[in-house]
């Protein structure tokens, strides 16, 4: 694989993984809030 391809793809992969990480963290937070609300009711 050409090094130029890596230079082009690296920022895209980093941004994609960062977005997935943030979405996953937000989803876990929402699930935890939902479970906590379920216990309080």
UniProtKB/Swiss-Prot annotation:
Assigned keywords, A-Z: Membrane, Photosynthesis, Photosystem II, Thylakoid, Transmembrane, Transmembrane helix
Predominant location category: membrane
Any one GO biological process: photosynthesis
Keyword DNA-binding among UniProt keywords: no
GO molecular function (one): manganese ion binding
Keyword Lyase appears in the UniProt entry: no
Localisation per UniProt entry: Cellular thylakoid membrane
A GO CC term attached to the entry: plasma membrane-derived thylakoid membrane
Membrane-traversing stretches: 5-23
Pfam families: PsbY
Topology within the bilayer: Single-pass membrane protein
InterPro entries for the chain: PSII_PsbY
Domain of life: Bacteria
Family, as annotated: Belongs to the PsbY family.
Assembly, per entry: PSII is composed of 1 copy each of membrane proteins PsbA, PsbB, PsbC, PsbD, PsbE, PsbF, PsbH, PsbI, PsbJ, PsbK, PsbL, PsbM, PsbT, PsbX, PsbY, PsbZ, Psb30/Ycf12, peripheral proteins PsbO, CyanoQ (PsbQ), PsbU, PsbV and a large number of cofactors. It forms dimeric complexes.
Reported function: Loosely associated component of the core of photosystem II (PSII), it is not always seen in crystals. PSII is a light-driven water plastoquinone oxidoreductase, using light energy to abstract electrons from H(2)O, generating a proton gradient subsequently used for ATP formation.
Protein name (database record): Photosystem II reaction center protein Y
């Amino acid at each position: 694989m050409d090094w130029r391809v890596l230079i082009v793809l690296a920022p895209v992969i980093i941004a994609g993984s960062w977005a997935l990480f943030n979405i996953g963290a937000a989803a876990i937070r929402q699930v935890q809030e939902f479970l906590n609300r379920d216990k309080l009711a």
